[in-house]
Structures are given as structure tokens and as C-alpha cells.
């Protein structure tokens, strides 16, 4: 009797891709991965070990280990300092001390590609500021935002709707979230983050050497995410699913902790300031309209108030489904 092989998350080499020379087959490869898995690993491993550089400019070179080292003193700050990380937007501020998720602690930096956004966060955490932290986080956010923009443009081009990309790009805002998962004690749950889909357009996740992230396939398999060196997990969120008229898959994912090491993770989450519309080109006889136009941050608020927030349930369909 044979055994079915467990599927693997696609890995796509991105190191040599520039927005000006992206070819059709590469665009289709990215689109197909997001349609079938809802995610893929963007591999930039042509660079030196531990160093990521998506441009020709020195300031965009990032040493990932240095980024994670900078998170440790941040999370070591007193709780009364960390809770100053607030926002009127749902899931944009401090999250922690939750009885049903005792291992997780997280903070959000809004408008993370701008000096003002990062400075506002840093000044709230450190009374005298923290210039080194500021520079590192903003550089990281800028680098990953370029990856996000490239991926988004590739999908738009693959669907033949690239004419909408520039106007969409003008409405993008980036939230950077830093996350810390402590190892569980003997009697605690190993669940660091419950199964959920992201409410974003696109999410891009990295982690330190401690594993734990799992992604659920359409067939119900939980796949452990194995990051190649110098790679990013690119994941579609519910807003991307709706924009694509249900072509792109928004996958469930979770964190399950093992061992006795702390896990640090960074996510860049893309939101749209305004109304998201399904392109008319993506509506036809084979793909009847499944979603109405919707306000992205309105959807985030809707989800935050949904009593079914912790269930595997299509929240975006409830919000704006036809």
C-alpha cells in the first residue's frame, strides 16, 4: 500500500527579477502558486549567506540576523511601555497577554516604509528614541515592500489587468508587525497562533531559525514552512482573494511551537486605503461575480467584531460576497 506524498510550498527564484524585465512565464508561475497554494517562498539566495539585496543600492542590503537581534530588546521592554503601541485600526497595535494565546506577543508599526511611521513607534517605546532600530526597521520595510510590489505587479500582468496597477499602488499602505512566541511550558498549549486567513491584500513573512509556521492546503494538509536561506513567504490575504474574484486562494495558517527556543517573526502586511473593486476583466461566464466592491479597513473592523473570528470560516464572503 502506497502513501501519498505531502505537498510542498512552491519555491520561486526571485533574485534576478527586476520589475522592468519580468517575463510572462515568471508572472504566470507566481499567479499559479497563489491560485493553488495561496503562497510561495520567494528565494533570494543568490546573495551572500544571510544577506538579502533586491536592488543595486547598498542601503537596501539587509542582514536578517541583525534584524532579529534588534527585536529582543524591544520585547524586553516593560509591558506598560509596550501597550503604548496603540492604533484606531483593528490589529494594528499591541497584541499580547491573551489567555487563549499565551505564547504570542506582537506589536505593529504603521506606515513602516516612512521615517515618520517608524519614528512614531520608536519614540513611544524609547523616551530618547532609538536611531539604529529606526534605520534597520525602515530599511527592512522598504526592501520587503519592493518585493510585495513586484509580486503584485506580476499577478496583475498575468491576469491582463496591469493597467490598474499604478492606481492601486498609489493607495497601498504597509503595516509591519513584529512577533515573539515563547516556548510553551509542560502543561501549556503549543499553539502560538490559531488557524486563520490574513485580512490583507498580501502578507510577507520571515522568521528566525525557529520553525513553527504551518500552511493549510486546499485539500486539508498542514504543511510546515521550511524557509530556504534568504527567502520570504509571500501569502495572499482575503482582500486579494476578493479582488481576484476568487481566483487567488487565501490560505489558513497557524503557528505551532516546539522545543525550548523563542521564535521571532516579522510580517509586512499590505492594506488598501479606499475601495477595492473586482476588475471587470476577471468577471465572465466561467467566473461570475462573487464579491462586491468593499472598503478594506471596513472589512478589518468587521472581522474584529465577528463572533466567529476564531473559526475557519469565510469572513470575506460574509462581508462583501454576492
Where are these regions (language model features)?
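Peripheral, non-catalytic segments flanking oxidoreductase cores
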Residues: 1-322
Amino acid at each position: 500500500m502506497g502513501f501519498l506524498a505531502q505537498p510542498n510550498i512552491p519555491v520561486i527564484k526571485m533574485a534576478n527579477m527586476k520589475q522592468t524585465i519580468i517575463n510572462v512565464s515568471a508572472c504566470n508561475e507566481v499567479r499559479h502558486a497563489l491560485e493553488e497554494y495561496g503562497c510561495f517562498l520567494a528565494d533570494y539566495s543568490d546573495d551572500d549567506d544571510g544577506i538579502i539585496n533586491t536592488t543595486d543600492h547598498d542601503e537596501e542590503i539587509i542582514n536578517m540576523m541583525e534584524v532579529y537581534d534588534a527585536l529582543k530588546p524591544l520585547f524586553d521592554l516593560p509591558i506598560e511601555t509596550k501597550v503604548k503601541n496603540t492604533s484606531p485600526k483593528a490589529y494594528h497595535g499591541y497584541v499580547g497577554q491573551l489567555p487563549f494565546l499565551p505564547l504570542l506577543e506582537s506589536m505593529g508599526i504603521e506606515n513602516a516604509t516612512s521615517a515618520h511611521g517608524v519614528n512614531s513607534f520608536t519614540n513611544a517605546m524609547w523616551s530618547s528614541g532609538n536611531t539604529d532600530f529606526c534605520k534597520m526597521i525602515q530599511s527592512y520595510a522598504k526592501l520587503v515592500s519592493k518585493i510585495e510590489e513586484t509580486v503584485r505587479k506580476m499577478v496583475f500582468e498575468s491576469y491582463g489587468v496591469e493597467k490598474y496597477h499604478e492606481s492601486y499602488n498609489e493607495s497601498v499602505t504597509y503595516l509591519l508587525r513584529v512577533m515573539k512566541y515563547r516556548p510553551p511550558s509542560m502543561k501549556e498549549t503549543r499553539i502560538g497562533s490559531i488557524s486563520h486567513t490574513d485580512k490583507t491584500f498580501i502578507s510577507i513573512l520571515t522568521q528566525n531559525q525557529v520553525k513553527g509556521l504551518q500552511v493549510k492546503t486546499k485539500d486539508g494538509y498542514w504543511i510546515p514552512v521550511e524557509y530556504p536561506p534568504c527567502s520570504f513567504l509571500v501569502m495572499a490575504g482575503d482582500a486579494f482573494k476578493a479582488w481576484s474574484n476568487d481566483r487567488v486562494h487565501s490560505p489558513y495558517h497557524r503557528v505551532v511551537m516546539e522545543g525550548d527556543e523563542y521564535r521571532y517573526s516579522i510580517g509586512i502586511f499590505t492594506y488598501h486605503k479606499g475601495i477595492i473593486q473586482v476588475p471587470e476583466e476577471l468577471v465572465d461566464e466561467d467566473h461570475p461575480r462573487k464579491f462586491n466592491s468593499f472598503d478594506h479597513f471596513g472589512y478589518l473592523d468587521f472581522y474584529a467584531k465577528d463572533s466567529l473570528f476564531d473559526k475557519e470560516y469565510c469572513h470575506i464572503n460574509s462581508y462583501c460576497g454576492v
